[in-house]
């Protein structure tokens, strides 16, 4: 029980009369429960109530009534006269209302003696204890105490002393007062923790000077934001920001400050050895002395100087870029138990003092000089930028693509110097699609330009990797010299150690395949798109370039309805004779001469693919779409063109039929097709071109079909069977023009008579 030594901080002579207003002192022996025990003829008001109401709005009419004794903890005597309610004073502090009795000045003096700056500190309810224990800012006396090193007691003015608080903040709920009416409030922390607080946060040494230093009228320093807890010290005020200016230790290193050092304040004897191990990409190490290093990837979208799993103390550390693109944070700090329970610290953390600056600077200078030979220090601004999601930044290189890696490409190929894009940095965005050798993403440059990015992985080994490198070199070489409104514009190329990025013009509406699947195509659309495709194809043929992969999926559309040829990975610039032999392309759109490995082909192969593309737009599906690719090869190899529906317009059917002639020499050129009535809109004067099924003798001299006794079909380039036998075999077969599947085809082949095969 805390005893009031006088109702005011007056002289010591009136203590006897003022003791009557206390709650049961030893001299009074219970006389405080009677008005006669006040020590004078005129009864002095005493403390009747001390209540912390939870209502935010104080109502004078309602709260001044004394009939609500059940809702408050009252220390008044039951003999209290209702007339004494006139002596009550209402004090509203902040958002809580208090009802007290007696002289206001005396109560304020009592609050000050108890170490509380407001009555709210004495009226905390048990239900609010847990939240207040964790988040409330405790009050301290207005004047600093004089601390006795012998007894650990704090003394205030007028020789008022009180023992250390009996409240343990680790308890789940506060202990009740002796009368069992209200919980006791934590007046202040225990003296040991208070002294520890002064040691760590306020002053380096304890102030114990008498005189005016402890005058209660003299203003003292403001209290800290948080008092020490039983489990340890809480986080102090934020440290001053780190100076990121260039230091004398290196152009890209952090400058050492008085309280923030790059390396620890102390260095073990094996410091140089540790740095040499870090240079060799040794994994994170932690020995008995408490020295550790942390290797983190530069791709983490966090502040590496703060979010390290080992060092969470907002202290800078050396961030070194390793050859593999990672960052090494080397911060050597001895374990210190004083920071064990800091909010963002652990056993490796240490609070730095100004006296360690010179020693740490010398240690860090030596360590950084040893690591600067093979490593470079990461820019601190770059480290802080990693807290936000950072875009993919690609460094520019001018080396030929064939020099990317000797293990990727072993074949000789012409060196291609990539063209630089018109921007410095860019970010990879939404995924748009994928192809044979890479994926396509949407990209945006720093200046706001949007484009398409073709990403290819150069780290793939084997035949596929070598083929990808050759294809990319060919595509870059062709696109660098192409500039046409109906061809996707090439913007530039960049690469890293294992990635190649090709920047192309972005067309937001996607390909023709996506367009007809989503909306369908009108006759006028097919006509307009075909004319634009022919214009771009003529531009390529005039420059001796065969596209070899014309189909709706490789033709893109912009918002204005302009179509452009794309995906030049299969394209090839032929010699002066204009022939090629490579077996490349998409099966459903390949010409018969391309399927035959012994035949050469020229620009007429693109005309066949164009006819299949126009048929695809008209029927909203690829040619031979119901067949598997091996069946498609068989049908095209035997000289069969896809069927043209009869419900199409005559001009459109004639245009497709002329493009799909099996004899490549009879196919028209791009100039001839641009003058076709389907393109010009003129009426047709002649009959529609009929598509007949040619005999196999036209291609039997260059290839053969091996029809084994099994139900499988094998297409071979070896002359293992007589052309005459194959011709008789095919002529006697009764096969529909468009079988539904390979199973249907096999069943019809098995129904053929053995006599016809023997003949």
Curated annotation (Swiss-Prot):
Residues 426-679 form the Protein kinase domain. PROSITE patterns: PROTEIN_KINASE_ATP, PROTEIN_KINASE_DOM, PROTEIN_KINASE_ST. Its main location: membrane. Disruption phenotype: Reduced chitin-induced MPK phosphorylation. Strongly reduced chitin-induced cell wall-associated depositions. Reduced accumulation of PAL4 and CHS transcripts in response to chitin. Double deletion mutant MEKK1a/MEKK1b does not phosphorylate MPK and is unable to induce the depositions in response to chitin. The growth of the double mutant is inhibited within 1 minute after chitin exposure as in wild-type. GO terms for cellular component: cytoplasm; plasma membrane. Induction: Up-regulated in response to chitosan. Belongs to the protein kinase superfamily. STE Ser/Thr protein kinase family. MAP kinase kinase kinase subfamily. This is Mitogen-activated protein kinase kinase kinase 1a. It comes from Physcomitrium patens (Spreading-leaved earth moss).
């Amino acid at each position: 029980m805390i005893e009031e030594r006088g109702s005011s901080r007056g002289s010591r002579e009136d203590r006897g009369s003022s003791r009557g207003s206390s709650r049961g002192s030893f001299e009074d022996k219970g006389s405080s429960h009677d008005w006669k025990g006040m020590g004078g003829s005129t009864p002095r008001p005493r403390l009747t109530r001390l209540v912390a109401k939870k209502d935010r709005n104080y109502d004078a009419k309602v709260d001044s009534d004394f009939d609500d004794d059940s809702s408050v903890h009252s220390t008044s005597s039951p003999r209290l006269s209702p007339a004494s309610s006139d002596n009550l004073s209402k004090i509203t502090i902040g958002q809580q209302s208090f009802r007290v009795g007696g002289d206001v000045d005396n109560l304020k003096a009592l609050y000050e003696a108890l170490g509380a700056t407001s009555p709210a500190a004495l009226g905390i309810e048990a239900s609010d204890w847990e939240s207040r224990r964790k988040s409330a800012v405790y009050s301290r006396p207005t004047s600093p105490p004089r601390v006795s090193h012998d007894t650990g007691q704090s003394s205030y003015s007028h020789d008022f002393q009180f023992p250390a608080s009996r409240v343990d903040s680790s308890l789940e709920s506060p202990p009740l007062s002796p009368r069992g009416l209200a919980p006791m409030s934590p007046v202040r922390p225990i003296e040991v923790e208070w002294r520890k607080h002064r040691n760590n946060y306020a002053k380096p040494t304890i102030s114990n000077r008498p005189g005016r230093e402890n005058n209660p009228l003299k203003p003292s320093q403001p209290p800290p934001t948080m008092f020490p807890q039983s489990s340890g010290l809480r986080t102090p005020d934020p440290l001053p920001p780190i100076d990121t200016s260039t230091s004398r230790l290196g152009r890209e290193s952090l400058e050492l400050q008085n309280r923030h050092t790059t390396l620890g304040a102390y260095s073990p004897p094996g410091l140089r050895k540790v740095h040499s191990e870090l240079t060799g990409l040794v994994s994170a190490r932690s020995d008995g002395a408490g020295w550790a290093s942390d290797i983190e990837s530069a791709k983490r979208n966090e502040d590496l100087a703060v979010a390290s799993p080992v060092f969470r103390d907002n202290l800078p550390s050396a961030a070194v870029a390793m050859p593999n693109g990672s960052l090494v944070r080397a911060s050597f700090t001895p374990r210190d138990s004083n920071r064990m329970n800091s909010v963002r610290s652990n056993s490796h953390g240490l609070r730095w003092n100004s006296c360690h600056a010179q020693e740490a600077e010398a240690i860090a200078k030596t360590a950084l000089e040893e690591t600067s030979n093979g490593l470079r220090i990461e820019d601190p601004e770059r480290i802080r930028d990693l807290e936000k999601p950072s875009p993919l930044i690609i460094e520019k290189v001018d080396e030929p693509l064939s020099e990317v890696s000797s293990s990727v490409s072993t074949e000789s190929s012409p060196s291609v110097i990539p063209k630089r894009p018109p921007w410095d940095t860019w970010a990879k965005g939404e995924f748009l699609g994928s192809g044979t050798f890479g994926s396509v993403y949407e990209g945006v440059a720093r200046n706001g330009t949007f484009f398409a990015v073709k990403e290819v992985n150069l780290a793939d080994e084997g035949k596929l990797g070598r083929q990808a490198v050759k294809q990319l070199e060919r595509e870059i070489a062709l696109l660098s010299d192409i500039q046409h409104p109906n061809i996707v514009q090439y913007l530039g190329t960049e690469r890293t150690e294992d990635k190649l990025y090709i920047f192309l013009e972005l067309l937001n509406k996607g390909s023709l395949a996506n367009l007809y699947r989503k909306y369908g195509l009108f006759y006028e659309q097919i006509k307009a798109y075909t004319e634009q495709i022919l214009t771009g194809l003529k531009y390529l043929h005039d420059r001796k370039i065969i596209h070899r992969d014309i189909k709706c999926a490789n033709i893109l559309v912009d918002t204005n309805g302009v179509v452009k040829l794309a995906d030049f990975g299969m394209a090839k610039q032929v010699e002066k004779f204009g022939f090629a032999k490579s077996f490349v392309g998409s099966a459903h759109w390949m010409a018969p001469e391309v399927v035959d490995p012994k035949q050469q082909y020229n620009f007429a192969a693109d005309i066949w693919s164009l006819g299949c593309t126009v048929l695809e737009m008209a029927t909203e599906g690829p040619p031979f779409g119901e067949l598997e690719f091996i069946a498609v090869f068989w049908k095209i190899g035997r000289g069969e063109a896809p069927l043209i529906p009869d419900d199409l317009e005559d001009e459109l059917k004639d245009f497709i039929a002329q493009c799909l002639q099996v004899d490549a020499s009879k196919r028209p050129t791009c100039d001839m097709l641009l003058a076709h009535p389907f393109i010009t809109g003129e009426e047709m004067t002649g009959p529609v071109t009929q598509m007949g099924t040619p005999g196999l003798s036209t291609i039997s001299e260059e290839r053969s079909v091996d029809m084994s006794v099994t139900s499988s079909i094998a297409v071979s380039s070896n002359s293992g069977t007589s052309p005459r036998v194959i011709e008789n075999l095919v002529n006697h077969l009764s096969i529909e023009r468009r079988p539904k599947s390979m199973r249907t085809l096999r069943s019809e082949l098995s129904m053929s008579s053995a006599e016809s095969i023997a003949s």
